Amino acid sequence: MIAFSLTMELSLPVFGVTQANKEEWDNIWKNFQQFPNVSRTLGLLRRFFLRNDLGFLSAVVILKQYVENLPTTKQKLNLIECTQGLKFLIRSLYEKIKDQCDVKSSIREIFYDCKARLLLLLEEGCGCGACCATSAALSKVGHLGRPPKLTPHKPHCSAQSALTCVHNHIILGMNPGMSEWMVLEIMFLPSDFYDFNEHKNEISLVATCINCCWLYFMLQQYMSSDLLAIEEALNKTYLALHPNDKASYSNILKFLTSNSHREHVTQKVNVKAFMQSSLYKIIKDTEKNPSPKTKMLMISILGSRGIGMDLFCSQSVLKAPLIDHKLSPVSEYEDFDEDEVELCISDDEVDSEDGNLCVLDDESESVNSVALRQVLTVDKQANEKEYKKIIDKSDDRDDRDKDEYELENEEYNRDEEEDEGEDEEDEKDEKEEGEDEGDDGEDEGEDEGEDEGDEGDEGDEGEDEGEDEDDEEDEGEDEGDEGDEGEDEGDEGDEGEDEGDEGDEGKDEGDEGDEGKDEGDEGDEGDEGDEGEDEWEDEGDEGEDEGDEGEDEGDEGEDEGEDEGDEGEDEGEDEGDEGEDEGEDEGDEGEDEGEDEGDEGEDEGEDEGDEGDEGEDEGDEGEDEGDEGEDEGDEGEDEGDEGEDEGDEGEDEGDEGEDEGDEGDEGEDEGDEGEDEGDEGEDEGDEGDEGDEGDEGDEGEDEGEDEGEDEGDEGTKDKEGNANKVVQNPFDYYNWLQKSTLSIVHNKSIHATEHMLEDQLQHSLTASFETHLYIKPFRNTKESQAATNFVYFREQV
């Protein structure tokens, strides 16, 4: 005989479990206790029994009674109230969107309607690429899918992150830790859709409603998925064994216990836990309306985000709905037929002290006849007692809530009265502070008037200091004028030097004659050499005469240049002095007028007292006029400075003339050296004439002439070859061209023949270089500088 408590434990045979595979069977349940994953355990059991439906049915019965006793199942039942609140919130939002008072659509219909509306708003409100991508992602997702991001114009969405986290936890069979306050994380505000203008309010409500629907479906899936999977496995397996029978908890237990054998391993099953109706409770209670407390909680959550208060103006949230007193399990309670179930319980077999039932165990019988007396009556009585306790607790809770509400109202009214009294006192204090500030302002105004009068006196002192500084500037200008006179005298000398340069050109021609003398000196031993010497001497004398004439002209030019420079400097100084005098006179007049008007304004301000501000204003105007006069004086000084600048320019020109004169002096020195060499050559020729070897002298003359001609021809060829080389390669002539250009600027002769300039340089060089200049880009700075010098050189030629 086996003793059972009132929990009604049965020894359930498990068909297919033997001593050979009992270890694997035990490991399955150990793993389930450590990691209670229902779907994974069902898969392991199905694989363990393969095609043995009877053994699998026993295993599912054992699994159900384990799941009913899990702590997570109790947590899931506590989420029923949260699901009711979400359902109430979804319907309220949908009524606001549709502008209707009563909506009878299901949550699934509301979800797909809002989804279609959101797709339309995204396309019509914006229609950009991001909106099209969001629409495409939303159109592919159902009410049980992974939620996409609903804010197309924002890179991140906190609502989508929260929903994705919950979705992943549910897929992995983990507790997502959801509550009513999660609604705050999945709500949208109009500011989240600021780019949609007039549609932003509607689109925020529609998107919030869709997120709430997703959260509602996730809650339902989390609460009912495990129990629903067990129910489906029980029904499917039992109907496979008994197609014509009704699948119920009692029929399943009767069927399994009627086929027990000794070779089968048995497992104890808690009948009460197996008969519990958690799934039925979840389904039925979710359809009920939420309690007033839950409604108020949802309203407060929405109000914390600034929306939702107008949604529930017509909701009578304080009226408690009628409560259904009837409780029933998933499978309706069934009365066992006493004829079908053999009860082997006698009165003397019941222990009244411990309440245990003694069930007879007949070893000869193969069937374990279990006395399944219905405990429904006992369960109903217990349920009724529990229900009464719940009703009493709810009534007490409602009474406490009302009392707390009244106390809060009284405290709120008292606080408002106290706040009003404090506000009146604050207003009085503000008025007194305003009067004090007015008095202080008057005192400050008087003090400021006196301070401004003092500032006027300081302004007069500043004007006097400014006049003293002007006097110092005048003295400095006088000293500068004296320096300008000296510079003018130097300019006159510079102009004379410029004219002296013209004489240097004549000396250059004399130098050519000296070169001829040098060539003639080689053949001085003969008579023909003497004649050549006389001719070259005559030409040299003529060159010297021309040089002397050039020097005379240069001296005259210098005198004229000095006279013109003196006149220009005198005119510039006179104009500068006149401008300075005019500016100073105007400045003095303006300052005198400003001082007089300032004194008058100050006197009037002191006499009138409170009306002194007007006098100070007039004084300021006078000071402004004085400043204008000073500005005019500054303008006169500027004109004087311009005159000085003109004088400086004249000095610069004089300096340039001096430089050119110095170059002319160098040319004179070279001419003198050439004359000395010519005299030496004449002396050597005279010595040759004195010798008796006339024939040798003639031969020497012939050889000297031939060598001179050959050297002259070679020099000419070299010059022509260099010119041709320059012309053939335009970029190799850079140094020669630069020297030639500088020679032109300083009035020197170009070291090239007229034939080269006219025929070759002017023609070939221009053609070849201009082609590169206007067609090809320059390769470096050297080429660019060469091009610039070439253009200037061509203009000078």
Curated annotation (Swiss-Prot):
InterPro entries: Herpesvirus_BRRF2-like. Residues 394-403 have a biased composition (Basic and acidic residues). Residues 394-724 are annotated as: Disordered. It comes from the Viruses. Residues 404-713 have a biased composition (Acidic residues). Belongs to the herpesviridae BBRF2 family. This is Uncharacterized gene 48 protein. It comes from Saimiriine herpesvirus 2 (strain 11) (SaHV-2). The lineage of its organism: Viruses, Duplodnaviria, Heunggongvirae, Peploviricota, Herviviricetes.
